[in-house]
Amino acid sequence: KRAVQSEKARKHNASRRSMMRTFIKKVYAAIEAGDKAAAQKAFNEMQPIVDRQAAKGLIHKNKRARHKANLT
């Protein structure tokens, strides 16, 4: 039973982690393109997602802080 639960949690966490990375990549892509408005919009969308994943324990709070600091 534990193995089945672990596999389910692993897939769920992988999905959430992938989603978070995608939002972070969108911010970097907007910055690379030089579009300040799009970068700000992408950053504002990314922030609560990263915060939520850190609160749930998917990533460490310091990693959350590092992502946000590097992109501001």
UniProtKB/Swiss-Prot annotation:
Disulfide cross-links: none
GO annotation terms (biological process): translation
Transmembrane spans: none
Domain of life, source organism: Bacteria
Gene3D superfamilies documented for this protein: Ribosomal protein S20
Keyword annotations from UniProtKB, A to Z: Ribonucleoprotein, Ribosomal protein, RNA-binding, rRNA-binding
InterPro entries: Ribosomal_bS20 (IPR002583), Ribosomal_bS20_sf (IPR036510)
Pfam families: Ribosomal_S20p (PF01649)
Coiled-coil ranges from the UniProt annotation: none
GO molecular function, a single term: structural constituent of ribosome
GO cellular component terms, A-Z: cytosol; small ribosomal subunit
Family of the protein in this entry: Belongs to the bacterial ribosomal protein bS20 family.
Protein task: Binds directly to 16S ribosomal RNA.
PANTHER family membership: 30S RIBOSOMAL PROTEIN S20, SMALL RIBOSOMAL SUBUNIT PROTEIN BS20C
Protein's name in the database: Small ribosomal subunit protein bS20
